[in-house]
Regions:
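Membrane-embedded transmembrane alpha-helical bundles that form the catalytic cores
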Residues: 1-231
């Protein structure tokens, strides 16, 4: 992580100085390459061994915590610097703070640099924000423990059952869909709550996606911090 932060710091400074798309592409290749090395090398090697009956050794690299999320954040920062949406951060410590914000590091939401750019310099903690943060975190924790986990256990019961009917598949499908939503949105709620306690205002990550009337609308409402990257 420290190496990636340093790379992002240097790449962003070079992008800001030279306005070069080539430097941006180089930065993207480096960060995505590191992500693939840590997450997918052993998967690729295992498949090669299976397909060609080889005995290549697995690297068994320890995957850095939150690598997917902080890679997306670094990429969005470098892209926004290139587009001129944000000023380049010349303070390495503040850039590191942005990348390593612990509330959302593991499960999101993916926080754009422009969202907290000012708060890195002039963050204010208030009683109202702290109270809201506690409430939001508690709500997320309850969604995870009382709803998502229970739905997960229900799905296990269905999978281990012997009777497989049309009604079974309907109930299982609905339970599984709700489990995914409550599990993921619970982590986002907890991250938003923790961030608010420390004076950071993260954007919402879910907006009732299951009431969507189209795939496009669903995409806009589900994992908003990711889908907004492609606009």
């Amino acid at each position: 992580m420290l190496a990636e932060i340093l790379i992002a710091y240097i790449v962003a400074l070079l992008i800001n100085k030279h306005k070069s798309k080539s430097i941006l592409v180089l930065g993207i290749v480096i960060h995505v390459g590191l992500l693939c090395v840590f997450k997918y090398t052993d998967f690729i090697v295992s498949n090669i061994n299976s397909l060609f009956n080889t005995n290549l050794s697995l690297l068994r690299l320890a995957i850095p915590i939150g690598i997917s999320f902080y890679t997306f954040q670094i990429l969005s920062y470098e892209i926004d610097v290139y587009r001129g949406k944000v000023k380049v951060q010349r303070n390495l410590l503040k850039l590191a703070t942005y990348v390593t914000l612990f509330p959302q590091l593991i499960a999101g939401p993916i926080v754009r640099y422009e969202t907290i750019e000012k708060e890195l310099d002039e963050r204010k903690e208030t009683k109202e924000d702290f109270a809201y943060g506690v409430t939001r975190f508690t709500t997320g924790l309850a969604k995870k423990v009382l709803i998502a986990n229970m739905l997960g256990e229900l799905c296990k019961v269905f999978l281990n059952g012997t009777e497989k009917s049309v009604a079974f598949y309907w109930i299982y499908g609905i339970a599984y869909a709700l489990q995914i939503y409550f599990d993921f949105s619970a982590y986002s709620d907890m991250a938003i709550g923790l961030g608010r306690m420390f004076g950071f205002h993260f954007l919402e990550n879910f907006n009732y996606p299951y009431i969507s009337k189209s795939i496009t609308e669903f995409w806009r409402r589900w994992h908003i911090s990711l889908s907004s990257r492609f606009k």
